[in-house]
Amino acid sequence: MSLNSLDLPGKPEDTRVVVAMSGGVDSSVVAGILKREGYDVVGVTLQLYDHSAAVHRAGSCCAGQDIEDARRVSESLGIPHYVLDYEARFREAVIDPFANSYVSGETPIPCVSCNQTVKFADLLQTARDLGADALATGHYIRSRANGAHRALYRPVDTDRDQSYFLFATTQEQIDYLRFPLGHLPKAQVREIAEELGLTVAKKQDSQDICFVPQGKYSDIISRLKPEAANPGDIVHIDGRTLGRHDGIVHYTVGQRRGIGVATGEALYVVHLDAANARVIVGPREALETHKVFLRDVNWLGDTPIADLPKSGMEVFAKVRSTRPPRPAVLRHADGQTWVELVDGESGIAPGQACVLYSDDSNAARVFGGGFIGRSEREPQAEEMLRRLMANADKASAA
């Protein structure tokens, strides 16, 4: 049997596709394209939170006006549309872990958790319950057949590349998901929205963390976890106490501006000592990192990660969403997985993701990745930080 444009057997009219509709232009265009090609399209929107500020705030998603926009687009396309209340699930799976992670001194990525749990687990099951052959989304990433399964690849429009936030997608989920925008540049997506007469054609793209009004995540965390706003010391990596802070929630590793101390030297946040409410600062060279240890690894390579050669596997690693993939070596031994960064990186924070690729081109395959549990700096900085933490432990025990 021949395959249709979604690599599924059968004619489009015999293929049901659930489209995850956020109310934005991307997912709306996905619904429009598939409807135009003759697929049996069903739109589903998740209500994830209900902050009153989001109702009229530009750049939000999955609440207020966005749900209404998704409904209007579905109506104009002539497709059924359902709104599912996932607010409690979103709080449990995304918002609470986000706050807990900050309290522990990490810099979390809630978008990964949302994709990993709510969107690609819960919503995928809903799509199956609706009898769908696939779940389509407006993410900028590509997938294509790889033997009996499908593999992920970076999109044509690397400026919109969302593969960093999708590294935790499991093989089972990848096989069921479809990403119709992966081969299109954003400008063309806007043009298609105009052609289809979609009311959201000129709508602003979502910005920042969707559930954080005006991007002030510290307000949300302080409300959920008041201890994150406990004051403490700002300490130089060499042991000097430089001043006080109003809560580690206001800081992240690699930060330079707004530290709150003036010493005449350029200082960066090197480490967040959550247990002792301390912000550790130091010179830029103290941020230089060549090795990161990963947890919760999702490996999508063809060879099982436990079977990697002792010499490791040459890959390209991305440790921040805004940075390009850089040369690295992936290693796995004794139950641990780590990545050695050939050129080193600065400002690597625990809780962030390290995503692995076959190369640095826009056709690179995504090999998965993991969350950064800890990292190793240059030997001198590593020893200074170790000594500083050991002294704090002794003081606490005294």
Curated annotation (Swiss-Prot):
It comes from the Bacteria. HAMAP family: tRNA_thiouridyl_MnmA (MF_00144). The gene is mnmA. Residues 160-162 are annotated as: Interaction with tRNA. The active site is at residues 114, 210. One of its GO terms (molecular function) is tRNA-uridine 2-sulfurtransferase activity. It is found in: Cytoplasm. One of its GO terms (biological process) is tRNA wobble position uridine thiolation. The keyword ATP-binding applies. It comes from Brucella suis (strain ATCC 23445 / NCTC 10510). One of its GO terms (cellular component) is cytoplasm. It catalyses: S-sulfanyl-L-cysteinyl-[protein] + uridine(34) in tRNA + AH2 + ATP = 2-thiouridine(34) in tRNA + L-cysteinyl-[protein] + A + AMP + diphosphate + H(+). This is tRNA-specific 2-thiouridylase MnmA. Catalyzes the 2-thiolation of uridine at the wobble position (U34) of tRNA, leading to the formation of s(2)U34. The record marks 139, 352 as: Interaction with tRNA. Keywords: ATP-binding, Cytoplasm, Disulfide bond, Nucleotide-binding, RNA-binding, Transferase, tRNA processing, tRNA-binding. ATP binds at residues 20-27, 46, 138. Belongs to the MnmA/TRMU family. Disulfide bonds join 114-210.
